[in-house]
Amino acid sequence: MSEIPLFPLPLVLFPGGRLELQIFEVRYLDMVTRCMQEESGFGIVMIEHGEQALTTREQQLPSVSHYGTYCKIVDFDQRGNGMLGITVEGQVKFVIRDYYEGENRLMMGDVRFLEKENLAPIPDKHAHLANLLGTLIDHKGISKALKDSGLEIDFAQALDVGARLTELLPCPNRYKQRLFEMKDPVARLGELEKLIERMQQSK
């Protein structure tokens, strides 16, 4: 097992995904400084209950999902508002064995890193999902800064398409987390088909 700092967020990030974050809480500024000095990373985990920011001493840490993604900082800058901006890239999934409150109220976790999913081409019956992903990227999902940062997507691979679609679809995070925890990228595409169909029917 490994001990890593955890960053609870109301979102799901897969390995290979990139995310821009604005850092303003002291505990996370300290964490980012330490990660950059040690060339280490931290875990992003989805919030199940509770708040992301801690504004009072009495406020409890949020409860989080047991599966997350270990990330590393790939870029940073000082924003116009004076806050630190960072771009992180997901590296590998992990499962949390235990988590607790550390120094500066930073959430720490004892985690086990998981094996990477197998690569598999997109079956013909799911090929249209790659087109949908392209449409989402053009109209919604990835900022110019993230595109410029070198985010690469293989539209022929089930893993890449399923991961990026899950991150970008406008659906509840609990559904995204279920897709995230799946181990078979082709099976994930099948579940995405069902989810998209339900979303279309509910319009």
Please report, for each region that a protein language model flagged, where it lies by residue.
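N-terminal low-complexity, acidic/polar interaction/targeting segments
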Residues: 1-203
